[in-house]
């Protein structure tokens, strides 16, 4: 059985090649928080968080650092550890950045216990390893038609994808319909198109 030793975080901010142009924000940089959870037995569980806003990194890191005291020398038991972390935040609240911090450490715990069992996490949880269909969603935000057409072709070619995803949510729904037509024309009938309308 693994026991908790320490959790550390490292913050990085990436400059996006294609900024995110959503209804609610224009994002040029992407924050990532790397999490390393060390056990007394030498196994390291890893995870990462992508909290959207760079300044949130310091708040989440601070919460995660507090979990060192909460979990010190505790056996790694994902469900029990999750509850301990969550309960330690009772007066702060169980949502937003606090639960994001809990989730990051929770993923690192699952990574550590599956490594200790010498299994991929999906197998440790009862699943199987196999091919997974993937699509490219690394673009196609709320851009104009000429940009969308060029980006759509690039996304398909980037990894020989058979499906891509675009975002909707323009002020006028007719502009969304035109954007869909533009992308469909650019990618042809052999590539599937998915959409997000979440802005």
At which residue positions do the language-model features occur?
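Structured beta-strand/loop patches that form or line metal/cofactor-binding pockets in enzymes
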Residues: 1-46, 50-52
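Residues at beta-strand starts and edge strands
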Residues: 31-33, 65, 132
């Amino acid at each position: 059985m693994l026991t908790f030793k320490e959790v550390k975080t490292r913050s990085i901010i990436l400059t996006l090649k294609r900024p995110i142009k959503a209804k609610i924000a224009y994002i040029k940089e992407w924050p990532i928080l790397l999490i390393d959870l060390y056990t007394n037995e030498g196994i390291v569980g890893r995870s990462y968080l992508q909290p959207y806003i760079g300044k949130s990194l310091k708040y989440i890191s601070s919460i995660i650092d507090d979990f060192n005291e909460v979990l010190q020398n505790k056996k790694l038991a994902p469900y029990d550890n999750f509850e301990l972390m969550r309960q330690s935040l009772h007066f702060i609240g169980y949502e937003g950045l606090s639960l994001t911090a809990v989730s990051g450490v929770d993923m690192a715990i699952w990574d550590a216990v599956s490594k200790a069992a010498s299994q991929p996490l999906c197998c440790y949880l009862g699943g199987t390893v196999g091919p997974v269909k993937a699509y490219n969603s690394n673009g196609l935000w709320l851009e104009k038609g000429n940009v969308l057409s060029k980006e759509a072709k690039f996304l398909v070619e980037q990894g020989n994808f058979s499906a891509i995803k675009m975002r909707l949510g323009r002020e006028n729904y007719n502009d969304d319909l035109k954007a869909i037509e533009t992308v469909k024309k650019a990618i042809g009938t052999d590539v599937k198109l998915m959409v997000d309308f979440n802005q």
